Amino acid sequence: MKRSYDSINECGAYINNAADNICQCKMNRIDSAFGGWLTNLTEVYYCPTHNIYHHCDGDGTCIIVNSVCTRSGTCMGISTLVGVTHDLMDIDSLPAFDRFKLRMMNKGYFWISMQDRLKEELEEAKSGDEGMTMETHFRNKPDVESTLTRLYYYFKRELGMITRGTQESKLEKVYIMFEEMALRLLESRMTNHDKKQKLLAKVSKLISKQNTKSHFTTSVNKLITSDLTYPERIVKPLMDLKLSELYI
């Protein structure tokens, strides 16, 4: 049964009513997703505007044009799509790291939104003791294991790519990695432009290679030369970062 729509939002997506934010954009039909991690997809549609997917199962919530589903009344996120299409995945041919990411997504862990997950933790911890480290904060969370696991694999992969060059060049690459993560985190959580600029400048100075007195220097050097087997050695530089250093 086709739905009727009475309004259009700013991006041109049809919505049921003014209070309904369900995406009703015209969605593109796809046969693979996530850079080829998911393959052989059937009746799966993607909205690039809202970065959501739809699996048309003929339940009557879709808009059909020329026998093709063009808009969905029931959209899904990544983990749901992975669950729906899990049997279609060509998992065995994937690298170990990609298999891990798919398993995490199938369990509901949104790997590509790891920065958002950390941002939420920082927001929650913001009202607490600013002298508390992220490690102490995470230890109070029931899902600390999954969070640390994702951090471990993220850093292990990034560090695994740093295989050539001098110690100084490796150190510079790791600084850039830390800085990019910090800036993305801070940029996503700040709404006040002036405060954002001050905070980004503060973090950039903190992590700058020229700031040799920064506690990051010692931590990163240890991280580069350490055994990558143990997650705590990978995430410790980040876990040791005091929350007060992320706020003005």
Swiss-Prot record:
InterPro entries: Herpes_UL92
Protein's UniProt name: Uncharacterized protein ORF30
Organism whose genome encodes this protein: Ostreid herpesvirus 1 (isolate France)
